[in-house]
């Protein structure tokens, strides 16, 4: 694993250390914009230079376009240009994705995160045409989100290669985890690469990723910043130590699910962002002691 000079490709649009931010809700289930703005400010103070709003961890399937846009506008109004705002706009409906992408552009997004269409299992040519249609519809940089564990269908290497020729398609959030493919695409395209799976943050840096779009960063954004800085400075041992220290948070996420874990963990640390919306549930009270232990083991 080589070290030093972490990639900066794409950082001007997508940042380097990003959190896929949860969407706070009031007790009655309505969106809590004030808490959303406060959480965004907290994450920026902890070291994030970009945030994903209304992504998977932001409960995009169960929030309306109006809620998504209102959150984006509220965070932009409060934080200004101090952070890059990446709007999650991907759905399994091309027309709906285009509509939300245009709304997000008008609301002040710096870039877009567009997930692979899920459930309908399109062909690779269908994926190519879907992403191309979205990219043609806006004037913003787009990050493809490749997550076959949720979408079932991966974006194959050849499809990403073809999509990279579109001027607006500039990055990939990789939750597929095939590092040799990532390395090949980084060498053969101008795409920026982002780890979309926290346990692989350090390995992705080693093949040329610019940074991370993290879930556990809600609780340890400062440590993720330190991890990237250590790697960039050639301190592999330091980067490895930080990565290992975050394993309890990664285990908790794997056990409970990202939204459930983050919302419960933030509440344990005095930041109540409300419960998830159905069909995602709050953490089982029987799990709270173990979650508290995970947080303590990770030093947060």
UniProtKB/Swiss-Prot annotation:
At the top level of its lineage, which domain of life is listed? Bacteria
- Could you tell me which Gene3D superfamilies the record lists for this protein? Aldolase class I
Provide an example Pfam family for this protein: DHDPS
EC class: lyase
- Localization per record: Cytoplasm
Matches recorded under InterPro entries: Aldolase_TIM, DapA, DapA-like, Schiff_base-form_aldolases_AS, Schiff_base-form_aldolases_CS
Query: Does the entry feature the keyword tRNA-binding, yes or no?
Result: no
Part of a proton relay during catalysis, annotated site positions: 56, 119
Question: Which transformation does this protein catalyse, written as a reaction?
Answer: L-aspartate 4-semialdehyde + pyruvate = (2S,4S)-4-hydroxy-2,3,4,5-tetrahydrodipicolinate + H2O + H(+)
Residues forming the catalytic site: 145 (proton donor/acceptor), 173 (schiff-base intermediate with substrate)
GO BP terms:
diaminopimelate biosynthetic process; lysine biosynthetic process via diaminopimelate
Biological function? Catalyzes the condensation of (S)-aspartate-beta-semialdehyde [(S)-ASA] and pyruvate to 4-hydroxy-tetrahydrodipicolinate (HTPA).
- Detail which positions bind pyruvate: 57, 213
Which EC numbers does the record give?
Answer: 4.3.3.7
Identify the taxonomic lineage of the organism of origin.
Bacteria, Bacillati, Actinomycetota, Actinomycetes, Mycobacteriales
Give the similarity note: Belongs to the DapA family.
According to UniProt, this protein's pathway is: Amino-acid biosynthesis; L-lysine biosynthesis via DAP pathway; (S)-tetrahydrodipicolinate from L-aspartate: step 3/4
Q: Which UniProt keywords apply?
A: Amino-acid biosynthesis, Cytoplasm, Diaminopimelate biosynthesis, Lyase, Lysine biosynthesis, Schiff base
Q: What is this protein called?
A: 4-hydroxy-tetrahydrodipicolinate synthase
List the Gene Ontology MF annotations in alphabetical order: 4-hydroxy-tetrahydrodipicolinate synthase activity
Q: How does it assemble?
A: Homotetramer; dimer of dimers.
Q: Which GO terms describe its cellular component?
A: cytosol
């Amino acid at each position: 694993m080589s070290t030093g000079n972490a990639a900066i490709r794409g950082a001007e649009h997508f940042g380097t250390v990003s959190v896929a931010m949860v969407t706070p809700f009031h007790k009655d289930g309505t969106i809590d914009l004030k808490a959303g703005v406060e959480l965004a400010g907290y994450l920026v103070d902890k070291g994030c230079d970009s945030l994903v709003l209304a992504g998977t961890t932001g409960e995009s399937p169960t929030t309306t376009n109006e809620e998504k846009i209102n959150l984006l506008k509220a965070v932009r109004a409060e934080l200004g240009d101090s952070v890059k705002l990446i709007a999650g706009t991907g759905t399994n409906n091309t027309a709906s994705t285009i509509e939300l992408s245009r709304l997000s552009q008008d609301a002040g997004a710096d870039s877009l995160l567009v997930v692979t269409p899920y459930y309908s299992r399109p062909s690779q040519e269908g994926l190519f045409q879907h992403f191309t249609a979205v990219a043609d519809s806006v004037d913003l940089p787009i990050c493809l989100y490749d997550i076959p564990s949720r979408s079932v269908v991966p974006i194959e290497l050849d499809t990403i290669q073809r999509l990279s020729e579109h001027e607006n398609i500039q990055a990939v959030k990789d939750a597929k985890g095939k590092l040799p493919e990532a390395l090949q695409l980084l060498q053969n395209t101008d795409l920026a690469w982002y780890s979309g799976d926290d346990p692989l943050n350090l390995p992705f840096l080693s093949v040329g990723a610019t940074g991370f779009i993290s879930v556990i960063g809600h609780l340890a954004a400062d440590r993720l910043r330190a991890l990237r800085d250590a790697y960039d400075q050639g301190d592999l041992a330091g980067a490895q130590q930080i990565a290992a220290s975050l394993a309890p948070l990664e285990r908790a996420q794997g056990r409970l699910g990202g939204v459930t874990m983050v919302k419960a963990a933030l509440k344990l640390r005095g930041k109540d962002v409300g419960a998830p919306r159905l069909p995602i549930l709050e953490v089982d009270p029987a799990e709270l002691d173990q979650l508290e232990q995970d947080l303590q083991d990770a030093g947060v």
